[in-house]
Amino acid sequence: MLPIRDENPTLRPPVVTYGIIAANLAAWVLVQGMGAEPALSHSVCSLGLIPGELMGRIPAGTSVPVGPGVTCRVDQPGHPLALLTSMFMHGSWFHVLGNMWFLHVFGNNVEDVMGRFRFLAFYLLGGLAAAAAQVLAAPDSAIPMVGASGAIGAVMGSYVVLYPRAGVQTFVFLGIWARMMVLPAFLMLGYWFLLQLLSGALAPSEGGGVAFWAHVGGFLGGIVLTPLFLNRRLLAEHKAATGLA
């Protein structure tokens, strides 16, 4: 399933959502060289999160291959700042554009009822919850973790809490069969969450390069954090104007 747009208007410009998208794209272009080597591998090595390094499970000085002819040299102790910087690093054009598209579709409505500063704090804490989940699931992993997926998972978890009945125009495809459908948010995002949960349970802890448990942790973190960051006045305004929430 690929969400195209939701049928859920906003009352205010999503300044923070657009700012986060701009920051991720700027990091991809200016820091990661748009995926060109050696900038990509060096950025993943220096700014990505290596669970085993953070947890002290990998011996200092260990070399971890991350790209063609590029290795990460593990330091001890691992730098906690990687929990934050890893949210703004990506592995490919598909990775960064896919993540930013999901944030574009769902982030504006969550920001609309939290307010800008609360939403920014929520997004970052959701990303930290996602990183913590992946580290706990694979504490010995030497594979660098990068991407905004966990933080965006938190946004999607919040969206389900706030707008379960909102329609989401979704491109649904199965083999050669494809169709555009309007699905309720709880169904579209519930399917996404179930897919991450099953993939995390059935795949190795390192997920073949996909941090499934970060997605799960982010989604659940978003559900838990939403009541703490929700602005009741903004929610009431949104509900009065749209009939949703």
Question: What are the functions of these language-model segments?
Answer:
Residues 1-245:
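A detector for small-residue-rich transmembrane helices and their helix-helix packing motifs
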